[in-house]
């Protein structure tokens, strides 16, 4: 059973999210005024990418070295709902060029996360102390207020020790270096419920900026993982909540995931988070462990108690995200991080200053990132800084625009879906473009085909009824047999050797025989090899010859003429075998070689001109998994034949056109279990009965059972005695007679 992770709060005495001096939430703070001075700046295309500031704190000068950190995509939108309940994007403009993170010169364990949009606003973290900085609004100069943030310790533990999901005490700890050569990206959608929206500002611009600060802090903490958290979109429930936000975090997470799967289809995102405000709460968060990239479980709930700092809220979010990547809580006796408090230590919520991931967390992340469960972190979103003003009517969808059909394009559909002067939806329209938007500017019904399968390794997608955009383009899982079991599917294409030959030489060509490959690819010259190195042609090992240069059979009498290439002919065993040779460095040179994923033997495929075992494809879709009536898609979900229903193609429905839980025509809310059980971590001690209280209960039950047995036995004995007495009496009477 998957683990549902809950974070116990105990945060009733932490500082408020936005107020620098909330009564009773912090130690006495010394607020001072400082004037930051910009001393260096590096620009690119008209905007700053690196900047250095000098400022004084308590009379001492510190140097802040900052680098621009983008986390907003160009199509970032903030959504809310109008009076009719229809979700609309808010007309706000956001800058993606003024968010920076860096360090304090001379302090290796320091961290700075600030926005420079309107002055400096953010957090400065030393080893064990944090400072908040923000512009002094009443000042005509560049004055800022700076104050020390010192959250008090909570009166209670953050977790019940018996419930804590710590790693095995025998867990082997190794020193893991961050994988800085590989970048990872996580796209999240954040929903702010009504009370949370009112608590942190009650204004769309103010709340949006605070969420930006939250993501900035989160990204700074995740820097050792080389992970960038992208805020793909933001949603405000300003008038009413779309789901009930009462109850414990377990049930709230279930409701949110159910709502997410039915209604949250805005744009591609990997995880969705619901931020909920409560005066007091036993828990501060919930998520599923290790399920970050599972669409059905990729979500979390963060409960924001009345008194909590922005720093602590960022730690809550980071811990939830880490848990969803399978990163466990630290054993403080064996895990180290170089700073007083590590990120995955529950006490991190109570501390100030820099918090880093421990060696244990780094190893957990390293294991997760090489597993199939991390596939959603591999795609890189476009993060071009949005510093240009949007121009309505230029035909480009820019920041703040819902649609832009150009100078003449708005007349294509009667009536026009897009207002050409505002680049917003026209009155009465619910969509403008996309394959799931009909001619009357309304969303197509759920289940209408929007992307047919283009070949046997592709699958169909349908409109989901809530978005004008067709579902993500899914395809058959890599490794599935195709072309009459001769080849396999790779990235949605049947990797057929015969088709490679036809693509290169025309319809008169076919895939070469083993004799052709063995003969030509053993020569290590222009006619055949396993690639080219700086020293010449690469030799093919006998087992790799089917993966070297592409060798085809040619069945026409016409002479082949290829532009910029030499065609090599060879008569081998009565077959005309041909290959191709481009000049070194030619843009088409890859076509000379057999493609990766081409079958080269039983259970083997080509990879980098070598014939290797196909186990690296991780193909595990047996016919039994989909009950012989479907195939697995690239999410490893069954895509069922017509009339057979997902998720396992076992049940049937006559009108079902086929598909999977990802196709857009399936009610995916059913995939969430009706009940989730808290298996570990952060459960209140008062929520369960101690064992010593249960023992007397069982003793009483046993005593009652014993008494009932004794009474029953006694009554039975009395009946036997009465029966014996009556028999004796009757016997005596008969003898007298």
Curated annotation (Swiss-Prot):
Which parts of the sequence carry Phosphoserine?
Answer: 731
Glycosites? 128, 226, 359, 464, 491, 571
**CDD domains noted in UniProt:** ZnMc_adamalysin_II_like
Q: Which residues lie on this side of the membrane: Cytoplasmic?
A: 710-737
- PTM summary: The prodomain and the metalloprotease domain are cleaved during the epididymal maturation of the spermatozoa.
Q: Domain EGF-like spans what residues?
A: 617-650
One Pfam family named in its UniProt record: Reprolysin
Q: In this protein, which residues make up the domain named Disintegrin?
A: 389-478
Record's subcellular location: Membrane
Proregion positions? 19-180
**What's said on domains?**
A tripeptide motif (NQE) within disintegrin-like domain could be involved in the binding to egg integrin receptor and thus could mediate sperm/egg binding.
Function field: Sperm surface membrane protein that may be involved in sperm-egg plasma membrane adhesion and fusion during fertilization. Could have a direct role in sperm-zona binding or migration of sperm from the uterus into the oviduct. Interactions with egg membrane could be mediated via binding between its disintegrin-like domain to one or more integrins receptors on the egg. This is a non catalytic metalloprotease-like protein.
Recorded protein name is Disintegrin and metalloproteinase domain-containing protein 2
Q: Which organism is it from?
A: Rattus norvegicus
């Amino acid at each position: 059973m998957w683990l549902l992770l809950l974070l116990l709060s105990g945060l009733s005495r932490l500082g408020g999210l936005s107020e620098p001096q909330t009564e009773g939430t912090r130690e006495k703070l010394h607020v001072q005024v400082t004037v930051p001075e910009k001393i260096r700046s590096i620009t690119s295309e008209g905007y700053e990418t690196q900047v250095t500031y000098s400022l004084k704190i308590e009379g001492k000068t510190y140097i802040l070295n900052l680098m621009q950190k983008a986390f907003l995509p160009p199509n970032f939108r903030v959504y809310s709902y109008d009076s009719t309940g229809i979700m609309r994007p808010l007309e706000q403009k956001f800058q993606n060029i003024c968010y920076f993170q860096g360090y304090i010169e001379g302090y290796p364990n320091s961290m700075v996360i600030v926005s420079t949009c309107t002055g400096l606003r953010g957090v400065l973290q030393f080893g064990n102390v944090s400072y908040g900085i923000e512009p002094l609004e009443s000042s005509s100069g560049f004055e800022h207020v700076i104050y020390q943030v010192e959250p008090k310790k909570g009166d209670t533990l953050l977790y019940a020790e018996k419930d804590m999901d710590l790693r095995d005490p025998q867990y082997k700890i190794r020193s893991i270096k961050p994988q800085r050569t590989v970048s990872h990206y996580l796209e999240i959608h954040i929903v702010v419920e009504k009370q949370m929206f009112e608590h942190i500002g009650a204004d769309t611009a103010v709340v949006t900026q605070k969420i930006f600060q939250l993501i900035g802090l989160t990204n700074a903490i995740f820097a050792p993982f080389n992970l960038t958290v992208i805020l793909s979109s933001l949603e405000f429930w300003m008038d009413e909540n779309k789901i009930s936000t009462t109850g414990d975090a377990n049930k709230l997470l279930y409701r949110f995931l159910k709502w997410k799967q039915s209604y949250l289809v805005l744009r591609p995102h990997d995880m969705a988070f619901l931020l909920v405000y409560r005066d007091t709460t036993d828990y501060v968060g919930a998520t599923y462990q290790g399920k970050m990239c599972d669409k059905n479980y990729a979500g979390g709930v963060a409960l924001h108690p009345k008194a909590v700092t922005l720093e602590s809220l960022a730690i809550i979010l980071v811990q939830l995200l880490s848990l969803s990547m399978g990163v466990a809580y630290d054993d403080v006796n064996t895990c180290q991080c170089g700073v007083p408090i590590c990120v995955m230590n529950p006490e991190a919520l109570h501390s100030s200053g820099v918090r880093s991931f421990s060696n244990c967390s780094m190893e957990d992340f390293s294991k997760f990132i090489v597993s199939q469960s991390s596939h959603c972190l591999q795609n890189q979103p476009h993060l071009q800084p949005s510093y240009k003003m949007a121009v309505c009517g230029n035909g480009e969808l820019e920041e703040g625009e819902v649609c832009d059909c150009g100078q003449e394009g708005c007349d294509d559909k009667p009536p026009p879906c897009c207002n050409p002067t505002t680049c917003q939806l026209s009155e009465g329209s619910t969509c403008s473009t996309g394959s799931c938007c009909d001619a009357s500017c309304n969303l197509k019904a759920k289940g209408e085909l929007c992307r047919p399968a283009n070949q046997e390794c592709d699958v169909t997608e349908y409109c989901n009824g809530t978005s004008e955009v067709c579902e993500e383009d899914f395809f058959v899982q890599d490794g599935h047999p195709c072309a009459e079991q001769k080849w396999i599917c790779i990235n949605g294409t049947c990797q057929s050797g015969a088709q490679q030959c036809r693509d290169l030489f025309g319809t008169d060509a076919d895939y070469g025989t083993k004799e052709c490959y063995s003969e030509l690819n053993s020569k290590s010259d222009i006619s055949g090899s396993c690639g080219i190195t700086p020293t010449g042609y690469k030799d093919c090992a006998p087992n790799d010859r089917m993966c070297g240069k592409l060798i085809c059979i040619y069945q026409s009498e016409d002479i082949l003429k290829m532009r910029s290439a030499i065609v090599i002919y060879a008569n081998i065993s009565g077959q005309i075998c041909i290959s191709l040779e481009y000049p070194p460095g030619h843009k088409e040179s890859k076509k000379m070689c057999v493609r990766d994923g081409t079958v080269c033997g039983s259970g083997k495929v080509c990879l980098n001109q070598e014939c290797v075992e196909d186990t690296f494809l991780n193909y595990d879709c047996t016919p039994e998994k989909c009950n012989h009536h479907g195939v697995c898609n690239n999410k490893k979900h069954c895509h069922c034949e017509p009339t057979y229903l997902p998720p396992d193609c076992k049940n049937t429905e006559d009108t079902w056109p086929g598909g999977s839980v990802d196709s857009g025509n399936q009610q995916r809310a059913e995939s969430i279990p009706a009940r989730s059980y808290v298996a570990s971590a952060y459960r209140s001690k008062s929520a369960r009965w101690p064992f010593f209280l249960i023992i007397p209960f069982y003793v009483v039950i046993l005593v009652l059972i014993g008494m009932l047995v004794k009474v029953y036995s006694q009554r039975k004995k009395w009946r036997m005695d009465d029966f014996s007495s009556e028999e004796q009496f009757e016997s005596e009477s008969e003898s007298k007679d």
